[in-house]
Each structure stands twice: as C-alpha cells, then as structure tokens.
Amino acid sequence: MYLMCVSLNYHQLPLDLREKFSFTKEEVPKADKLLNDEKSILENLLISTCNRTEVYAVVDQIHTGRYYIRRFLAEWFHYTIDDFTKFVTVTTKDAVAEHLFKVITGLDSLIKGEPQILGQMKDAFQIATKEGTTGAILNHLFRQAITFSKRMHTKYRVSELAQSSGQAGLHQIKMQFGSLEGKTLAVVGLGQIGKHTAYNASNMGFSKVLLLNRTDSKAEQIATELQGVVEARPFNQLATVVHNVDAAIFAATVKQPLFKADEQISTMIVDLGVPRNVAVNSTKLKYYDVDHVHMILNSNDEKRRLMIQKIANEIPQEVNDFYIWEKQLHIVPVIRGLREHSLRIEGEAYDSLLRKLPELDSHERKVISKHMKSIVNQMIKGPIKEIKELSVTPGATADIDFFCKIFGMDNLKVENQNNDK
C-alpha cells in the first residue's frame, strides 16, 4: 500500500484556474464516494479550499493510483487527462505526511501561518469518515495531523499573529475584552474584507455577530450561510446597532463616513475603511483605524517568521512518528494474537481454580480475576514493547516468526511491510 497526494494549488495555478478546479461543500461527499469506487483506490479524502484542491489517498500501486485519481479529477472538471495532468502535483510515500503537516499548520498557505486551514481539514476528514472512504492509515494520519496542528496553534499562539486587517481587528477586540463570551460584534460592510471578517468572527466565541450591508439581501445571504450566532440587521438600523453592541468592525467602501462617533458611545470601533467609515469627534473613544491595524500586522511579521520556523522544525519528528507507526502496522495481528492467547490461558487457569475452590465468594473471585489479568498484562508488556521495536528493523520477518514460535502462535502468518509496500 502507498500513500499519495494529488494536488492542484496556488503554487502552480493562478486564481482563475483554481476556480475551475474547486468542489463545493455539497459536491465533496459525492466525490469522495465516487473516487473510492475507482480501481486501485483503497482509502481517500478530498479537500477543496480557495487555495487548493487535494486528494489524499492510499493506493495499491503508485502508477495505477496516480492514473485513476487524475482520470477521476479530469472527468469531473471536463478536461482530457493529458491536458489536466500538467496542472497536477503528485506526492507519494514518505513525502505525503510531511506535506500534510505543512498544509494543516498553515506553512504551505498563501498567507503563511493562517489558522483557517485546520478547520477546513477537520471538516474534510469528518466528511470522508462519514462517507466511509477512509481506513486505518488515513484515519491515523489525519488524527495525528489535526492533533499536531492544534498543539502548534496553542504552543506558538498562532491566532495572535493576525494575517489580515480583518483578523488583526478581531485580535485587537479579543485583546480588549479577554473573553468574548456574552459579547456582541457588528460587522458593517460585507465586501471581501468584511465577509472574511464575518466568517472568522462566527467561530471566535461571540454571543452574537450582527451583519449590516447597504444591500440588505447580501447581509441576509451571508447570515444564512453562517447561521449559528450570525444574524443580519437592516442597514437603516446602523446607528442603533452600533450603539448597542460591544464592538463594531467597519469595512465598507464609501466616500463619506457612515457613522459619527462621539464620547457618549462605549462601543469599541475598528475602522478598516479607506476613506474611513467613522467620523470621530473625541479622543476618548476606543477607536482603531486602518493605520493602527497595519501597525499590528507589521509588528507581527518578524514574530510570524520565527513562529513558522519553529513549527517547521517540529515537523520531521512528527513525520518520523507516523512512519514508525505505519511500519508497525503488520505487527498488530501478532500483538493481538499474543493478547488473546494470554487471556485464553488466563481464563482457563481461572476456571480451573474456581472448580478446585468452589467455596470462594463473588468478591474473592473478582479479586483473584483482577490480579491474574494484571500478572498476564505485566508479563506480556515487555515482549510487546520489544517486538514493536524489532518490527521496524531489516530482519523483522525472521524476528516476528521467532516471536510467534516462542509464544506458541505458529498459526499467525505475518508479511513484513516497509515504506515501499
């Protein structure tokens, strides 16, 4: 079996081409199932974002797996396989785990270190597992990758190094309030910046996120997409909404201010508009304009570079851990066999003991059973640890056969597998 990743991403493709090779959320489950029916594909998972469309797969042979994945994608997007192939990057074997760990931590993103990719990968994994297209290898790889990414986000405080003006504004609000529980945010103006800000704010912990746009239907559409804590408000209620929320982010494109703020207002305001959306009549306000936000972004550049390097330095060990696990897959039946063999002997000895000592009450029987199981587990703990270590050495097959003979498990036939099988 081989790991494989077939990728269409921003490194090779400009936006106008990436748009042609993307799946909608509704299409991904169907595509996962259809791809899984192709020859050579044992496991598969598909992810599609604005920066990449990728298939992660376990295939029985590299050349056939590569062909059928390419053919599937080419047919889906109505290309000939020859024309489609020039857009594709294929990664195989050891390099797949390294690639995934870079992608899921944001190191391979257009904006380095961006945290959204973790959520997108989690969603893709959940869809694939629900559709039944993943198995032992992809399940383990993606669970490990998700755990690793979460650990990196916590360890290096990734979310604090904002990557866009909207993210920087949200970070400033979080710094102001600490906890966002019970807080309400208004997002005014739903162009590219405002829309992305709304998407990011929707899962930050605000109790409500209120959307306002000069075209009310756009606010309603985005609120319907996001649901949860996100609600639309009519634009003619702007003044009332801003006065009653805890914080507001303005991101509209206007020539004249949309709102006048004086010292009577307690709302924290982040103004990303150029020209500014808010006319400020007091220096006492909690007000941040786009220059303040850019200062945050610029101050984070060096911190972000160091963060990215630190995360990159941790990836090789994570990759090594995965491939040690993969190499040990073939030893799983042996370990399971040893446990079952040992428990069977323990069970027979326990039954024999009860026949010889029928006067034992239920409590005494439970104590004896517990201690017998403990003895068995302690006895096999050492051998299991040793055979796991031996299973990744060049002479693994002979060692495993000898191990089985020692413990009376000659009936177990185990094939040695390495990275190339």
UniProtKB/Swiss-Prot annotation:
It comes from the Bacteria. Substrate binds at residues 49-52, 109, 114-116, 120. It catalyses: (S)-4-amino-5-oxopentanoate + tRNA(Glu) + NADP(+) = L-glutamyl-tRNA(Glu) + NADPH + H(+). Pathway: Porphyrin-containing compound metabolism; protoporphyrin-IX biosynthesis; 5-aminolevulinate from L-glutamyl-tRNA(Glu): step 1/2. GO terms for molecular function: glutamyl-tRNA reductase activity; NADP binding. The record marks 99 as: Important for activity. Its EC number is 1.2.1.70. Possesses an unusual extended V-shaped dimeric structure with each monomer consisting of three distinct domains arranged along a curved 'spinal' alpha-helix. The N-terminal catalytic domain specifically recognizes the glutamate moiety of the substrate. The second domain is the NADPH-binding domain, and the third C-terminal domain is responsible for dimerization. Catalyzes the NADPH-dependent reduction of glutamyl-tRNA(Glu) to glutamate 1-semialdehyde (GSA). This is Glutamyl-tRNA reductase. It comes from Limosilactobacillus reuteri (strain DSM 20016). The gene is hemA.
